Amino acid sequence: GGEKRRAAIAGVIAMNPEVLVLDEPTAGLDPMGRDVLLSQIVQYHKERKNTVILVSHSMEDIARVADKIIVMNKSNLVMFDKTKEVFSKGRELEKIGLRVPQITKIMLELREKGFDVPEGILTVDEAMNCISSLLDKEGKIW
């Protein structure tokens, strides 16, 4: 899915804009289409070093690709920081109607229950590494 959208984005990229602004580029795409498109956006940024501004309500997408995040609420700038820093403020984000990535929320809840997990876990791989370090050889949490 998303061939027309990818073709449209490719047409814009061919013009080599200094700043590429994408508004909800993954909306309505199936998971595979979303993964392909996000990978292409990341690759474009790495190769050309151009600025990419991604507007999205999908915090999972933002967590996967963004270096920095601007959070707006009612036309006001609420936060501007590195991705891990913004998502470590999950409760503040929830107050303005934004959700952190699901895995970040789970890790935040573990932290609030007293488990020694760091803030800013954004991916399943990071969470697995963190949780496995909490387990003993028998698979029990200390």
Tell where the protein language model's regions lie, with residue ranges.
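Catalytic Walker B motif of ABC-type/P-loop ATPase nucleotide-binding domains
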Residues: 20-23
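H-loop/switch region of ABC-family ATPase nucleotide-binding domains
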Residues: 56-57
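A short, surface-exposed alpha-helical micro-motif characterized by mixed small hydrophobic
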Residues: 62-64
